[in-house]
Amino acid sequence: DCLATTVMYKKKFSKEKFKVFHPGGNIGNSLLLAEDIMVTRNKMPTINYKKNLNAALKEMNKKKLGIVVILKNKHIKGLVTDGDLRRESKNFSKNEDLRKFMTQKPMVVNESMPASKALAIMNEKQITSLLVVSDNHLKKTNKILKGIIHIHFLLKHGIK
């Protein structure tokens, strides 16, 4: 271990290089960030806030993450989960305004959050997905969605 550490120091081999050159190892996995694991762009289940519940269900089924993010001009307005809909299944019509069912302030993390911390948040809050925003949008009220992390992505990467 001493020899390996000395060589790493002399060669200026940082933890970040470990992440690049040895991504499947324990050190590489421990350095993964939210932005390394999230889905982006056309893989994200999103819908305009003016759409109805039927359109949201179609998007949710198409993207298969169990959620749909409600957007207004690219800004996060809320989130609807398959669990939200199951709990209300006897009380809605597919033509209803989906804002009636949405969580208005969903859990949001920044892109540079360690993936292991994202998993800890999911476990603590008993949720399966987190919305990811850029570091400079985290404290803003109008957050722009950058990606989505699902708990299965974290487990697939061996995050603990």
Regions found by a protein language model. Give the residues of each.
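Short alpha-helices
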Residues: 1-12
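Short, conserved, surface-exposed binding loops centered on an aromatic residue
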Residues: 28, 36-38, 49, 58-62, ...
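Phosphate-coordinating loops and pocket residues in cytosolic domains that bind phosphorylated ligands
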Residues: 20, 39, 87, 91, ...
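Cyclic nucleotide-binding regulatory module and flanking cytosolic helices
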Residues: 14-38
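Bateman (tandem CBS) regulatory domains
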Residues: 30-44, 95-106
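Phosphate-binding active sites in nucleotide-utilizing proteins
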Residues: 61-62, 66-73, 78-87, 91-104, ...
